[in-house]
Amino acid sequence: LPPISLYIHFPWCIQKCPYCDFNSHAVKAGIPEHDYVDALLKDLRNDLSLLTAPRTVSSIFMGGGTPSLFSPEALDRLLAGIGQLLSLSEDCEITLEANPGTFESAKFREFRALGINRLSIGIQSFDDRHLKKLGRVHSAAEAIKAVEIAANAGFDNLNLDLMFGLPEQTEAEAIGDIQSAIALNPTHISFYQLTLEPNTYFYKFPPKLPEDEAIFAAQKACQQLLAEHGYRQYEISAYAKVGFQSRHNRNYWQFGDYLGIGAGAHGKITRALPHDIVRTAKPKSPEQYLKQTYPSASLRISSPSVEAIPVEQLPVEFAMNHLRLTNGFSLADYQRLTGLSPDTLEPALTQCLEQGLLVKQQQRIFCSDKGWDFLDVILEKFIR
């Protein structure tokens, strides 16, 4: 069976950003911390009934929303409860997402003392003008201060989230953001292009974005700068110093399993290969999530929140994840993780190799430089 991770979703934010299509809700009248932790542990207990064998969790990721809005006491109770229900690897990577507006020194020292060993800080830009347009509640100065607080609290594994292709952003401004991030010496940088997603304010009222050519040029210049400073790209939008790739995200991209608990969380669990891989989905509304009741374990597999992945869908699901990684996948991994013969990747695989979109080297398949820019085209071939 593949490695397994745990994703925990915290759906509350100080305010909803206009570009955000994640399941996040502005805090209106306080956060029901105690009830939510109870619900998370109940949810986890229930999901464990789907496992066909004991599994050891190699990473935990607390995402949102803004998980750092929760108190250290609430997260302590949550992590203690998880420790009683799950076996965690000795070097388990435990990540907490945090936004610069929520940083207090004492609070983050306590988070570190709980065993949280990686922080992911949602900075997005170091330019106050762009932060304002993005609806962020922090300033550039607060972003820099947050990184300082994190380092002083003992966090030596730190990701900074940044975006490019922002409304009216110039190439020089995008480069400036990357230079500011590098100067803070994080171990990992996530660098995403802003996209206008359905069901967001920006989608309804689109801001003026730079031309595609300008976005592409800015991206290439920033990538070069990251490489020069020791940040090696290992996924479409992820750059890490040696030894600091995100174990949790790598597990997603390598078609690993993950338990997903919390409002709107998704999971993937391999019960047996190739015919018994399931996806789980939880109610998106925090109110509904807090009220939900759980069927007995025997009914769990047929409940509406659990869906089997059809075998014919496995090739595209596998390719969709693995081809985001610079080193792609081996045909042996494909067989091991899906239970299917590499022949099931045809005819798409041969077509992509012939068109120079994919490269095959010693039984490894990965995107060519050209394919990297046409990932959507590659995936369409696997879908057909």
Task: Give a label for each model feature.
Residues G339-Q351:
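Short amphipathic alpha-helical interaction segments
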Residues L353-Q363:
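A short, conserved structural fragment
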Residues P3-S5, S24-L50, T56-L340:
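C-terminal scaffold of the Radical SAM
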Residues K370-R384:
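Short, amphipathic alpha-helical interaction segments positioned at domain boundaries
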Residues L6-F10:
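Short active-site neighborhood of thiol/selenol oxidoreductases, capturing the structured segment around
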